[in-house]
Amino acid sequence: MALKHFLQFNDLNADELAHIFERTRWIKEQFKAYQQYWPLTDRTLVMIFEKASTRTRLSFEAGMQQLGGSAIYLNTRDSQLGRGEPVEDAAQVISRMSDIVMIRTFEQEIIERFAANSRVPVINGLTNEYHPCQILADIFTYIEHRGSIKGKTVAWIGDSNNVCNTWLQAAEVLDFNVHVSTPPGYEVEPERANLYGTDHYEEFTDPMEAARGADLVTTDVWTSMGFEAENEERRRDFHDWQVDADMMRVAGKDALFMHCLPAHRGEEVTADVIDGAQSVVWDEAENRLHVQKALMEYLLLGKVQV
């Protein structure tokens, strides 16, 4: 298979995603049955972190080990990347000493430049612009609980951040709808709105209307990493964009709730929702592990049939 990266959700087409979701299901079944599956023996994943993480590091490191490979952790503070080495040079060296690379950083441009100079697949573990692995896990979680997401409606409540951007990309690829409701001043950037078009998403000023009849309601923290100086201002601005029991009732009894975590109970979501019967956040978090295993398998081995 030709070298392929996963830097944005739409780097994979619907057929490739269907394969990855099916492989995720099988890989998860093997994991739950304590069945060893080591297709990546002697393969090495290098994980480069500029942004701190719990779930991203744990899911990639454990996932690579569970597939029989090994994972090496680098952060920019302790490597030459943090001392001014050009990204292009680092990519040349790191990709000669590894089989696959995951990067969690601030600017999408950094990961794009790294991938352009890499000999091995590069995965976006998160940037300010996109969070594709999270949406892979979210959609797989929806499929587990409700079946195909095609034609369904996802309500995004809160900041139009990297997770929101990735939902918009996913809607185009997999043919579902996204309702976006943000406070004034936090809307989807016009250039992104033009990029994604309006066939699969609609913006709402009223968050309750965005959630009405939705199949999935999802949100994220009001203040993402890098915006801590705006925390108090954002708490005021986002006050009415909280997912609570009333919003879930408007969505409907079969609607699911998701959150990429970590969550701030009492801010973007109430405790009774995130800990309630419609919440699937713990399955969603676990599925980062399994869907990323399927992703790494695909990027390194192509379409495996077992």
UniProtKB/Swiss-Prot annotation:
EC number: 2.1.3.3
Residues the entry annotates as binding carbamoyl phosphate: S53, T54, R55, T56, Q80, R104, H131, P132, C133, Q134, C260, L261, R288
GO BP terms, alphabetized: arginine biosynthetic process via ornithine; citrulline biosynthetic process; L-arginine biosynthetic process
Lineage: superkingdom: Bacteria
Enzyme class: transferase
Catalytic activity: carbamoyl phosphate + L-ornithine = L-citrulline + phosphate + H(+)
GO cellular component, one term: cytoplasm
Protein localization: Cytoplasm
Keywords: Amino-acid biosynthesis, Arginine biosynthesis, Cytoplasm, Transferase
Listed SUPFAM superfamilies: Aspartate/ornithine carbamoyltransferase
Molecular-function GO term, any one: amino acid binding
Metabolic or biological pathway, per its Swiss-Prot or TrEMBL entry: Amino-acid biosynthesis; L-arginine biosynthesis; L-arginine from L-ornithine and carbamoyl phosphate: step 1/3
Residues where L-ornithine binds: N162, D220, S224, M225
Family: Belongs to the aspartate/ornithine carbamoyltransferase superfamily. OTCase family.
Function: Reversibly catalyzes the transfer of the carbamoyl group from carbamoyl phosphate (CP) to the N(epsilon) atom of ornithine (ORN) to produce L-citrulline.
HAMAP family, per database record: OTCase (MF_01109)
NCBIfam families, per the entry: orni_carb_tr, PRK00779.1
Entry protein name: Ornithine carbamoyltransferase
